[in-house]
Amino acid sequence: MLSLTAARPADCDALARTSRAAFDADVLVGAPGPGGPPGYDSSEWCRRALAWGRVFVIAEDGRTVGGAILIAHSADWMELGRVWLEPSVQGRGLGRAVLADLEQRAPAVRRWTLDTPAWNLRNRHFYARCGYAEVGIDGDSVRFEKRVEAETPG
């Protein structure tokens, strides 16, 4: 069973391990080499992120398999700073379920944004399937945005 919970400092070793596995595996889909965004493989960076972002543990049957970091820019604008899953659980719909769960947890958010490396066609297709539209290129990254309409009562 999939669960998404708020991270605590004690979770950061597992989050760094799964992040390293996920981002380093991107060499299989076009990355120029192993690596990821700043601090992607650092437990200490994760602990610092707890102070400025909403960090989540993604677990399947109690085992940490990934994570996510949200950055609130305003009451109605949320940035998906990072989301990752270990390669062993990718391709099974977990990523789509995680994004849907994150959106449901923030019903006031109308604008979701993220970026991904331009070379990562797999991510670009994934985000498009989840309702995100490419809205620009910033250096080597593609920016995405998803607008969510307010639900009308009744």
Predicted features, each with a name:
Residues 3-17:
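A short beta-loop-alpha structural element at the N-terminal edge
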Residues 17-45:
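Conserved GNAT-fold acetyl-CoA-binding loop/helix
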Residues 43-57:
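A short helix-loop-beta-strand connector motif used in the catalytic cores of GNAT acetyltransferases and
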Residues 57, 63-72, 79, 84:
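Conserved beta-strand in the GNAT
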Residues 72-83, 90, 108-109, 140:
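A conserved beta-turn-beta hairpin within the catalytic core of GNAT-like acetyltransferases
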Residues 85, 91-104, 125-129:
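Conserved acetyl-CoA-binding loop-helix of GNAT-fold acetyltransferases
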Residues 87-90, 113-124, 140-141:
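Conserved beta-strand-loop-alpha-helix junction that forms the acyl-donor binding cleft
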Residues 99, 106-118:
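Conserved GNAT acetyl-CoA-binding A-motif
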